[in-house]
Regions:
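Helix-loop-helix "hairpin" substructures at the membrane interface of multi-pass membrane proteins
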Residues: 134-207
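Generic alpha-helical transmembrane segments of integral inner-membrane proteins
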Residues: 21, 25-29, 70-78, 104, ...
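Loop-to-transmembrane alpha-helix initiation sites
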Residues: 16-19, 64-72, 91-95, 139, ...
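Transmembrane helix-bundle core of multi-pass membrane transporters
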Residues: 3-15, 86, 94-154, 182
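Transmembrane alpha-helical segments in multi-pass inner-membrane proteins
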Residues: 198-249
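Membrane-interface capping segments at transmembrane-helix boundaries
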Residues: 154-155, 264-272
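Short loop segments and helix-boundary regions at transmembrane helix junctions
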Residues: 32-115, 211-223, 240-243, 266-268
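C-terminal binding/interaction regions
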Residues: 3-9, 123-127, 228-265
Length: 272
């Protein structure tokens, strides 16, 4: 218990908790429509884009967020346009962008000396990466995502399940898809430095899948995913501090355990 109390005396831990909880909440709320629209791997693609952008920023000595945010937002919008206006499917478009951006990041880091530690934290995350700017941005991002759900819940529901019907009823499908893409891009950028490029997409996918295993209504899945994501992050970050393991990997394993537990519960429920 004393070790747990000691954990909260460190400012960087407190910042990591605040940013992580808000990013986990945003990722889960955005993840539900993305998973249902079969666009869930956008998180993986955008994290690789962010890795490439951050690698260039570090190599040039620039501030990371001002470089990575516009690049990842543009990549998200580009992916959206590629899937809407070309014959390329969403999975193929994400694969092309993801592989290209990852290749850029790897080449840049290989040509730059003294970046081994920075690359390690980019790939697998670090709680030391959070600063006050991350806290402020995560608060603003969370507010934007909550406003989207509170004010435009029914429109979001419509574009998630039937874009043609939503378009026929006057919903601006393109606008809401763009908003989803931009918010997802911001979530990935903010969460990647703590979770790592290889693992940040799990915050988008796991809570939504776990909630969909347990519940059937859209509203129930959204609320359950949000709660699960926050709880799993808190357990993962605490476990990471106690056991000295990487934050991103620990949070993913906690999410995996929750997913497997939900599957087991549902199988027992069907068998009884």
């Amino acid at each position: 218990m004393s070790l747990l109390l000691e954990m909260f005396t460190y400012p960087f831990i407190l910042r990591a908790f605040v940013v992580g909880i808000l990013v986990a909440l945003c990722a889960a709320l955005l993840g539900v429509p993305l998973v249902l629209k079969r666009y869930s791997m956008i998180g993986d693609g955008l994290s690789h884009v962010s890795f490439g952008a951050l690698s260039i920023a570090l190599a040039c000595g620039w501030a990371p967020l001002p470089v990575s945010i516009p690049v990842v937002v543009l990549a998200a919008l580009g992916l959206l346009r590629m899937t809407e206006r070309s014959r390329m499917g969403a999975d193929a478009a994400i694969a092309v962008v993801s592989a290209s951006a990852l290749a850029v990041g790897v080449v840049v880091t290989s040509l730059t000396t003294g970046m081994t530690t920075d690359v390690d934290s980019l790939m697998f995350g670090s709680i030391l990466a959070m600063d006050r700017a991350d806290v402020a941005l995560s608060v603003g991002l969370c507010a934007a995502v909550l406003v989207l759900y509170v004010l435009f819940y029914h429109r979001l529901f419509a574009i998630t399940f039937d874009e043609s019907f939503a378009r026929a009823t006057g919903v601006k499908v393109g606008l809401y898809n763009t908003i989803l893409s931009v918010l997802t891009a911001l979530t990935i950028v903010l969460g990647m430095r703590m979770m790592g490029a290889m693992l940040i997409s799990s915050l988008v996918i796991f809570p939504a899948l776990t909630a969909m295993t347990l519940l059937r209504s859209f509203r129930g899945v959204v609320i359950c995913a949000a709660g699960l994501s926050v709880v799993c992050f808190c357990v993962g970050l605490t476990g990471s501090y106690l056991w000295g393991t990487p934050v991103g990997a620990t949070v993913v394993l906690v999410n995996l355990a929750a997913f497997l537990l939900s599957r087991g519960v549902m199988k027992l429920k069907r068998a009884s």
